[in-house]
Amino acid sequence: MIRLKLRTGAIAATVLLLVAGAAEAQNVRRVAPERLTGYWFLTNKSVNPDVPNTGKNLDQPTCVAVTYMIGSDGRTQNPTIAKVEPAGDLGQVGVSIVKQLSYVKGSQNGTAEPVQTYYVTGFNLPEDPAKKAAILDKCKLPGYQTT
């Protein structure tokens, strides 16, 4: 009986923590990438992503959008593939890039407030600026503050 009560209590505590975490995540400001510098400045000059040797559509012009949170310490958290266009195996490369990003707080972020944002990167993009922009535009995500 005691074990059962402890397990039930542990399960209830876990559920409460998950609900509290989800509620906290919903309160994080969502900022579009083009507005991010008011909140956080990227400090990386380069990254060294993990790139697969084989996979689907690795040689096609592709855009990848990865959502993530920038924590109060300037580190990225919870990178998640949001979109890969066309579908293929380059999404993990985008996650690998985001995991390496680091930030310092911007002028509008005196308390180092965490924000939710996303990163778009392209692979095998054409030289023509209009064609390149058309591919990258496919990975813009709705629901992020743009003003």
What are the residue ranges of the model-derived segments?
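Bacterial N-terminal signal peptides
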Residues: 10-19
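Charge-biased low-complexity segments
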Residues: 2-5, 23-147
